[in-house]
């Protein structure tokens, strides 16, 4: 929930909390998207060294740090720096979460599309719940900073489930039908 919520509401945060004009917000989105390319390669390299699960746990801790840092951001340049970090872990977490999920699909199945449809559905539900919670906290407290800080709770829940995840050991990659 937290990752998608941060990605969807980053520009809104910059607008409401920092008063950034549209051209600076567009630059922020470009920074995030371009850096995400490098982030996906970086975390692919890291996952070869420490494994998918440990890489995901590392990225979730970085996401928690991003949420805490967002609470304290006061300048456009701090926001750009945070956007750089968001892009780096966004690219990594999107690619590694899908590849890790693929490892959980039973090797005997030929219907991979159904599994990934479920993955996409849960992602969309997470966006709705995360955005609702973000808005609800903003309404209660009057600040998007508190909402960003509250997103740490979602990442803590994610760490809880990741810690219990056991990835199957496979000699070879599953064959796709």
Residue ranges of predicted features:
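Short amphipathic helix-loop junctions that connect adjacent transmembrane helices
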Residues: 8-25
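Loop-to-transmembrane helix entry/capping segments in MFS-fold secondary transporters
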Residues: 22-23, 107-119
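Helix-to-loop junctions at the C-terminal end of transmembrane segments
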Residues: 38-52, 138
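Structural signature of the two symmetry-related core transmembrane helices
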Residues: 54-69
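Helix-loop junctions at membrane interfaces in 12-TM secondary transporters
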Residues: 71-83
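Intracellular juxtamembrane helix-capping segments at the cytosolic ends
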Residues: 92-107
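A membrane-interface helix-boundary motif in multi-pass transporters
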Residues: 136-156
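Multi-pass alpha-helical transporter architecture, strongest
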Residues: 149-177
